[in-house]
């Protein structure tokens, strides 16, 4: 099994992290270890390849960054757990759809460990609780290698989601783990559990 490096990076600025992710993907070869980065970002909107300006309703003072991942606009901020997956899909013998499924199921597994019943939707990537979106996915594949990843709402200020049509869906309600649990979850514990779930679903456990 190829090596997997997992980095818990804490709160890091979006743009330098994006550049580091691009650089790793650009410079890697068949011997480069796969990496998963688990982190938080300061407030930022990111607009995917399919992103339409009309879904940015009122960004205000929050910066907007155009990126090469799939999907529409989303929001990142403190208290949201972001996982970036830099994986050699050919080496893992994984298709993009299989990777998306593994990511979604990892989130379902993680949330189930907290007693939260969540599920993916066939027509809208991400993970949902009773129709409300708790996690978003957006990937890019270059030369058979993935980058970008997923974002799970843990314990955060949700109001910036009201400034956009999340993922291009007007009126889509976003939800977070804190709202579904008797007490706020420990962020570091959620991060560790997501690492374990991703390792298991990707065959690294």
From Swiss-Prot:
The lineage of its organism: Bacteria, Pseudomonadati, Pseudomonadota, Gammaproteobacteria, Pseudomonadales. CDD domains: LipB. Residues 30-205 form the BPL/LPL catalytic domain. It is an enzyme of class 2 (transferase). The record marks 133 as: Lowers pKa of active site Cys. Signal peptide: none annotated. Belongs to the LipB family. Catalyzes the transfer of endogenously produced octanoic acid from octanoyl-acyl-carrier-protein onto the lipoyl domains of lipoate-dependent enzymes. Lipoyl-ACP can also act as a substrate although octanoyl-ACP is likely to be the physiological substrate. GO terms for molecular function: lipoyl(octanoyl) transferase activity. It is found in: Cytoplasm. The active site is at residue 167. One of its GO terms (cellular component) is cytoplasm. This is Octanoyltransferase.
């Amino acid at each position: 099994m190829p090596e997997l490096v997992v980095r818990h990076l804490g709160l890091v600025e979006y743009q330098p992290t994006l550049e580091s992710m691009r650089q790793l993907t650009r410079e890697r070869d068949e011997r480069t270890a796969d990496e998963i980065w688990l982190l938080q970002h300061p407030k930022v909107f990111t607009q995917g390849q399919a992103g339409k300006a009309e879904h940015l309703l009122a960004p205000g003072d929050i910066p907007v960054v155009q990126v090469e991942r799939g999907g529409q606009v989303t929001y990142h901020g403190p208290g949201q757990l972001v996982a970036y997956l830099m994986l050699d899909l050919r080496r893992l013998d994984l298709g993009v759809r299989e990777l998306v499924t593994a990511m979604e199921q990892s989130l379902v597994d993680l949330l189930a460990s907290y007693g939260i019943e969540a599920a993916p939707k066939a027509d809208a990537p991400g993970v949902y609780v009773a129709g409300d979106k708790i996690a978003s996915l957006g990937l890019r594949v270059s030369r058979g290698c993935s980058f970008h990843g997923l974002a799970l709402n843990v314990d955060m200020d949700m109001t910036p989601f009201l400034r956009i049509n999340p993922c291009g869906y007007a009126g889509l309600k976003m939800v977070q783990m804190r709202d579904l649990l008797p007490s706020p979850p420990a962020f570091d514990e959620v991060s560790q559990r997501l690492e374990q779930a991703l390792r298991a679903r990707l065959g690294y456990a």
